[in-house]
Amino acid sequence: MLLHIPEVLNGQELATLRETLAGADWQDGAATAGAQAVRVKQNLQLPAGAPDARPMGELVKAALLRHPLFQSAALPHTVLTPRFNRYEGGGHYGNHVDSAIHADPFLGVSVRTDVSTTVFLNDPEDYDGGELIVEDTYGVHEVKLPAGDAILYPATSLHRVESVTRGTRLASFLWTQSRVRDDARRGMLFQLDMTILSLRGKLADAPEVVALTGHYHNLLRQWADA
Protein backbone atom coordinates (compact mmCIF):
# COMPACT_ATOMS: atom_id res chain seq x y z
CA MET A 1 0.00 0.00 0.00
CA LEU A 2 1.30 3.41 -1.01
CA LEU A 3 -0.37 6.28 0.84
CA HIS A 4 -0.06 10.06 0.63
CA ILE A 5 -0.47 11.62 4.10
CA PRO A 6 -1.11 15.38 3.84
CA GLU A 7 -0.08 18.09 6.30
CA VAL A 8 1.98 16.02 8.70
CA LEU A 9 4.07 19.07 9.59
CA ASN A 10 2.69 22.58 10.02
CA GLY A 11 4.33 25.80 8.86
CA GLN A 12 6.08 26.53 12.14
CA GLU A 13 7.50 23.02 12.37
CA LEU A 14 8.75 23.22 8.80
CA ALA A 15 10.38 26.59 9.43
CA THR A 16 12.13 25.26 12.54
CA LEU A 17 13.46 22.21 10.72
CA ARG A 18 14.63 24.13 7.66
CA GLU A 19 16.37 26.79 9.76
CA THR A 20 18.21 24.16 11.80
CA LEU A 21 19.15 22.07 8.77
CA ALA A 22 20.49 25.15 6.96
CA GLY A 23 23.34 25.32 9.48
CA ALA A 24 23.85 21.58 9.85
CA ASP A 25 27.10 19.73 9.23
CA TRP A 26 26.11 17.14 6.62
CA GLN A 27 28.06 13.99 5.76
CA ASP A 28 28.29 11.75 2.71
CA GLY A 29 25.17 9.58 2.73
CA ALA A 30 27.16 6.59 1.49
CA ALA A 31 28.57 6.24 5.01
CA THR A 32 25.26 4.74 6.18
CA ALA A 33 24.46 2.63 3.11
CA GLY A 34 24.57 -1.15 2.92
CA ALA A 35 26.82 -3.15 0.61
CA GLN A 36 24.46 -2.92 -2.37
CA ALA A 37 23.06 0.57 -1.76
CA VAL A 38 26.47 2.22 -1.30
CA ARG A 39 27.14 1.82 -5.03
CA VAL A 40 24.08 3.85 -6.01
CA LYS A 41 23.74 6.37 -3.17
CA GLN A 42 24.90 9.94 -3.82
CA ASN A 43 23.37 12.30 -1.28
CA LEU A 44 24.09 14.03 2.00
CA GLN A 45 22.78 12.86 5.34
CA LEU A 46 22.64 14.39 8.80
CA PRO A 47 24.83 12.30 11.14
CA ALA A 48 23.03 10.68 14.06
CA GLY A 49 25.54 12.36 16.36
CA ALA A 50 24.71 15.88 15.16
CA PRO A 51 23.56 18.13 18.04
CA ASP A 52 20.05 18.65 16.72
CA ALA A 53 19.52 15.25 15.09
CA ARG A 54 17.48 13.75 17.90
CA PRO A 55 15.20 16.72 18.76
CA MET A 56 14.43 17.27 15.08
CA GLY A 57 13.74 13.57 14.64
CA GLU A 58 11.45 13.55 17.66
CA LEU A 59 9.55 16.53 16.22
CA VAL A 60 8.85 14.62 13.00
CA LYS A 61 8.02 11.43 14.87
CA ALA A 62 5.52 13.18 17.15
CA ALA A 63 3.84 14.80 14.14
CA LEU A 64 3.41 11.44 12.43
CA LEU A 65 2.14 9.70 15.54
CA ARG A 66 -0.58 12.29 16.03
CA HIS A 67 -1.78 11.91 12.43
CA PRO A 68 -4.73 9.47 12.23
CA LEU A 69 -3.86 8.29 8.72
CA PHE A 70 -0.37 7.25 9.80
CA GLN A 71 -1.75 5.41 12.81
CA SER A 72 -4.34 3.59 10.72
CA ALA A 73 -2.07 2.69 7.80
CA ALA A 74 1.19 1.87 9.62
CA LEU A 75 -0.26 0.37 12.82
CA PRO A 76 3.03 1.30 14.48
CA HIS A 77 4.67 -0.91 17.06
CA THR A 78 8.05 0.87 17.02
CA VAL A 79 8.95 3.97 15.02
CA LEU A 80 12.65 4.54 14.47
CA THR A 81 13.87 8.06 15.15
CA PRO A 82 13.51 9.94 11.84
CA ARG A 83 16.64 10.91 9.93
CA PHE A 84 17.33 13.66 7.39
CA ASN A 85 18.83 13.78 3.93
CA ARG A 86 19.71 16.36 1.31
CA TYR A 87 19.99 16.09 -2.46
CA GLU A 88 21.53 18.74 -4.73
CA GLY A 89 23.96 19.14 -7.63
CA GLY A 90 22.99 15.90 -9.34
CA GLY A 91 22.56 13.95 -6.11
CA HIS A 92 20.46 10.82 -6.45
CA TYR A 93 19.85 7.37 -4.97
CA GLY A 94 19.57 4.49 -7.41
CA ASN A 95 17.25 1.50 -7.21
CA HIS A 96 17.45 -0.32 -3.88
CA VAL A 97 15.40 -2.07 -1.22
CA ASP A 98 15.75 -0.94 2.39
CA SER A 99 17.54 -3.23 4.83
CA ALA A 100 15.23 -5.60 6.70
CA ILE A 101 16.61 -4.63 10.12
CA HIS A 102 17.65 -1.16 11.27
CA ALA A 103 19.13 -0.05 14.57
CA ASP A 104 18.14 3.14 16.37
CA PRO A 105 21.12 4.67 18.21
CA PHE A 106 18.82 6.75 20.39
CA LEU A 107 16.34 4.03 21.39
CA GLY A 108 19.01 1.34 21.67
CA VAL A 109 16.90 -1.17 19.73
CA SER A 110 16.88 -2.87 16.34
CA VAL A 111 13.58 -3.24 14.55
CA ARG A 112 12.13 -4.98 11.52
CA THR A 113 11.46 -2.42 8.79
CA ASP A 114 7.90 -3.02 7.58
CA VAL A 115 6.93 0.49 6.50
CA SER A 116 9.06 3.23 4.94
CA THR A 117 8.05 6.88 5.23
CA THR A 118 9.42 10.04 3.61
CA VAL A 119 8.35 13.48 4.85
CA PHE A 120 9.07 16.28 2.37
CA LEU A 121 10.55 19.44 3.92
CA ASN A 122 10.48 21.82 0.95
CA ASP A 123 8.10 22.38 -1.93
CA PRO A 124 8.40 20.81 -5.40
CA GLU A 125 9.01 24.27 -6.92
CA ASP A 126 12.25 24.57 -4.93
CA TYR A 127 14.07 21.95 -6.99
CA ASP A 128 14.05 20.08 -10.30
CA GLY A 129 14.15 16.30 -10.29
CA GLY A 130 14.28 14.51 -6.96
CA GLU A 131 11.16 12.42 -7.55
CA LEU A 132 10.78 9.39 -5.31
CA ILE A 133 10.05 6.43 -7.59
CA VAL A 134 8.40 3.43 -5.93
CA GLU A 135 7.90 0.16 -7.82
CA ASP A 136 5.36 -2.39 -6.63
CA THR A 137 3.05 -5.05 -8.05
CA TYR A 138 0.72 -2.34 -9.36
CA GLY A 139 3.35 -0.48 -11.36
CA VAL A 140 5.75 2.43 -11.01
CA HIS A 141 4.72 5.43 -8.88
CA GLU A 142 6.34 8.89 -9.02
CA VAL A 143 6.10 10.95 -5.84
CA LYS A 144 6.96 14.62 -5.31
CA LEU A 145 4.84 16.20 -2.59
CA PRO A 146 4.32 19.62 -0.96
CA ALA A 147 6.38 20.54 2.09
CA GLY A 148 4.98 18.91 5.21
CA ASP A 149 3.34 16.00 3.37
CA ALA A 150 4.48 12.39 3.70
CA ILE A 151 4.44 9.26 1.59
CA LEU A 152 4.13 5.85 3.23
CA TYR A 153 4.96 2.62 1.40
CA PRO A 154 6.06 -0.97 2.13
CA ALA A 155 9.75 -1.24 2.99
CA THR A 156 9.91 -4.26 0.67
CA SER A 157 9.44 -1.95 -2.35
CA LEU A 158 12.15 -1.31 -4.91
CA HIS A 159 12.58 2.47 -4.97
CA ARG A 160 14.93 5.30 -5.96
CA VAL A 161 15.34 9.08 -5.87
CA GLU A 162 15.94 10.75 -9.23
CA SER A 163 18.80 13.22 -9.74
CA VAL A 164 18.25 16.74 -8.41
CA THR A 165 19.39 19.07 -11.19
CA ARG A 166 18.41 22.42 -9.64
CA GLY A 167 17.98 23.56 -6.07
CA THR A 168 17.97 21.41 -2.95
CA ARG A 169 15.64 18.60 -1.90
CA LEU A 170 15.31 18.21 1.87
CA ALA A 171 13.45 15.32 3.47
CA SER A 172 13.08 13.29 6.60
CA PHE A 173 12.90 9.52 6.31
CA LEU A 174 12.13 6.73 8.74
CA TRP A 175 11.06 3.14 9.19
CA THR A 176 8.32 1.59 11.27
CA GLN A 177 7.91 -1.88 12.66
CA SER A 178 4.20 -2.47 12.31
CA ARG A 179 2.02 -4.56 14.58
CA VAL A 180 0.97 -6.32 11.35
CA ARG A 181 4.02 -7.27 9.29
CA ASP A 182 2.16 -8.29 6.10
CA ASP A 183 1.44 -5.36 3.78
CA ALA A 184 -1.68 -6.93 2.25
CA ARG A 185 -3.21 -7.42 5.69
CA ARG A 186 -2.31 -3.87 6.72
CA GLY A 187 -3.99 -2.64 3.55
CA MET A 188 -7.18 -4.56 4.27
CA LEU A 189 -7.30 -3.26 7.84
CA PHE A 190 -6.73 0.28 6.62
CA GLN A 191 -9.57 0.08 4.09
CA LEU A 192 -11.87 -1.44 6.70
CA ASP A 193 -10.96 1.29 9.19
CA MET A 194 -11.66 4.03 6.61
CA THR A 195 -15.01 2.41 5.78
CA ILE A 196 -15.98 2.25 9.45
CA LEU A 197 -15.11 5.93 9.92
CA SER A 198 -17.19 6.89 6.88
CA LEU A 199 -20.18 4.85 8.03
CA ARG A 200 -19.91 6.20 11.57
CA GLY A 201 -20.17 9.72 10.17
CA LYS A 202 -23.46 8.77 8.50
CA LEU A 203 -24.95 6.20 10.88
CA ALA A 204 -23.32 7.04 14.22
CA ASP A 205 -23.14 3.88 16.34
CA ALA A 206 -25.70 1.85 14.44
CA PRO A 207 -25.53 -1.92 15.10
CA GLU A 208 -23.92 -2.49 11.70
CA VAL A 209 -21.14 -0.02 12.50
CA VAL A 210 -20.53 -1.65 15.87
CA ALA A 211 -20.40 -5.07 14.21
CA LEU A 212 -17.88 -3.93 11.61
CA THR A 213 -15.76 -2.37 14.34
CA GLY A 214 -15.78 -5.70 16.13
CA HIS A 215 -14.65 -7.47 12.96
CA TYR A 216 -11.80 -4.96 12.58
CA HIS A 217 -10.51 -5.60 16.08
CA ASN A 218 -10.89 -9.36 15.77
CA LEU A 219 -8.81 -9.33 12.58
CA LEU A 220 -6.21 -7.12 14.23
CA ARG A 221 -6.14 -9.45 17.22
CA GLN A 222 -5.56 -12.42 14.90
CA TRP A 223 -2.85 -10.78 12.78
CA ALA A 224 -0.98 -8.54 15.22
CA ASP A 225 2.46 -9.58 16.45
CA ALA A 226 1.96 -7.84 19.78
From Swiss-Prot:
EC main group: oxidoreductase
Record InterPro entries: Oxoglu/Fe-dep_dioxygenase_dom, PKHD_C, PKHD_hydroxylase, Pro_4_hyd_alph, Pro_4_hyd_alph_FE2OG_OXY
Keyword Transmembrane appears in the UniProt entry: no
Keyword Iron assigned: yes
Cofactor(s) this protein cannot do without: Fe(2+); L-ascorbate
Enzyme Commission number(s): 1.14.11.-
Domain of life: Bacteria
GO biological process: DNA damage response; intracellular iron ion homeostasis
Residues annotated as binding 2-oxoglutarate: R169
Domain annotation Fe2OG dioxygenase: ranges: 78-178
MF-aspect GO terms: 2-oxoglutarate-dependent dioxygenase activity; iron ion binding; L-ascorbic acid binding
Residues holding Fe cation: H96, D98, H159
Cofactor comment: Binds 1 Fe(2+) ion per subunit.
Name recorded for this polypeptide: PKHD-type hydroxylase HNE_2117
Originating organism: Hyphomonas neptunium (strain ATCC 15444)
